[in-house]
Structures are given as C-alpha cells and as structure tokens.
Amino acid sequence: MKLFTGLIFCSLVLGVSSQWYSFIGEAAQGAWDMYRAYSDMIEAKYKNSDKYFHARGNYDAAQRGPGGAWAAKVISDARERSQRITDLIKYGDSGHGVEDSKADQAANEWGRSGKDPNHFRPPGLPDKY
C-alpha cells in the first residue's frame, strides 16, 4: 500500500512539474513572439499598422499554448497601462489616447482569441511583415 501511494504521489508531482515546465516554456516563447512583433512594428514605421502588429504578436504568442496566451495578456496589459500613465503625464487627464488604447486592447484580444491578425493589416504593408 505504501509503495502504491508513493507511486501515485510521485506521478502526480512529475505530472504537475512537467506541466509547469511546459507553461514556462510557452510563456518565454510567447514573450519572444511579442518582442518580435514590436521590433517589426518599429522597423516597419508604417502608418496605421500598430493594430496589425498588436494582433499578430498576441496571435503568435497564443498559438504557443496557455503559457503564451498568458504572457501575451500580461505584456499587452502592462504596455497599455504604461502608455496611459505617460499620456497622463504628457497631456493631463484630457482623455488623449483612451480610444487608441481601447482599440489596441481590442486588437490584442482579437489576436489572442486565434482570429486572423491580417484583419488589421493595412494596405501596402510589405510582405516581410
């Protein structure tokens, strides 16, 4: 009986720990996907393309699995919060940027939910992206 209990306990511990390793790996890969989309957005400097890159980064990260989707949400939320703080400092409580922030969050959610990020792709954006 003790041997059986020990085997069950060990299998549970190993099963849970392997899930954590998977989650952590997915989160790291998802964070990299988000960084790559941000880098591409900076490199492209293409007018009206930010929503596409938001959706693409979140989409790519979420495709990694639950860890990637979690990383995408955390990074997206942190970015929007920090942007709101800088808007308050720069413009005061004028509401400047609130609509853009909401549109960014909608694009983020669109991508995380598995919908095609090309929905936000502006005409003429180079195929490289």
From Swiss-Prot:
Tissue: Detected in liver.
Keyword vocabulary terms for this entry: Acute phase, Amyloid, HDL, Heparin-binding, Secreted, Signal
PROSITE patterns (alphabetical): SAA
Subcellular location: Secreted
Record's signal peptide: 1-18
Pfam family, one: SAA
Superkingdom, taxonomy of origin: Eukaryota
Region of interest (Important for amyloid formation), residue spans: 19-44
Single Gene Ontology BP annotation: acute-phase response
Cellular component aspect of the GO annotation: high-density lipoprotein particle
Classification via InterPro entries: Serum_amyloid_A, Synovial_Prolif_Regulator
GO molecular function: heparin binding
Region: Disordered, residue numbers: 92-129
Reported induction: By bacterial lipopolysaccharide.
Note: SAA2 is more amyloidogenic than SAA1.
Similarity remark: Belongs to the SAA family.
Function: Major acute phase protein.
Illness association: Reactive, secondary amyloidosis is characterized by the extracellular accumulation in various tissues of the SAA protein. These deposits are highly insoluble and resistant to proteolysis; they disrupt tissue structure and compromise function.
Assembly, per entry: Homohexamer; dimer of trimers. Can form amyloid fibrils after partial proteolysis; the native, undenatured protein does not form amyloid fibrils (in vitro). Apolipoprotein of the HDL complex. Binds to heparin.
Matches recorded under PANTHER family: SERUM AMYLOID A, SERUM AMYLOID A PROTEIN
Protein name: Serum amyloid A-1 protein
Organism for this UniProt entry: Neovison vison
